[in-house]
Amino acid sequence: PCESFLKSELEDGTLLSKLTAEKVDFVVLAGFLLKIPDEMLTVFPDKIVNIHPSLLPKYGGKGMYGMKVHEAVVAAGEKESGITIHIIDDHYDEGSVVFQTTVPVLPTDTPEDVAHKVHELEYKYFPQVIDEMISKL
């Protein structure tokens, strides 16, 4: 199932109650910007996965998302960027890396160009990696 929720439901435990009531085994986040509460991490150890639009640990952490990441990659003159699919832990973008792949960043690339390349990686690999992870449950 796919569930929408309010930030307050994440913070007050309502979401966790819903997930456990539905007997959810695995949680998939996509560019999720909020910190997951410790209690939820305890109930779902190594079973909450997220995707980040850079090659972590570069360009990760609180406040690094979307175009901010791609702008930083271009500003730093990076030769490559990519995606990281990782397990959520109690720190922003520091969980165990499940999968990474890269794309070249050309000297002529704009942040929008990099974003397009990274989105293509996300569309291709995120569903595949999720399927592989679920098959191992």
Locate predicted features.
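One-carbon transfer enzymes
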Residues: P1-L137
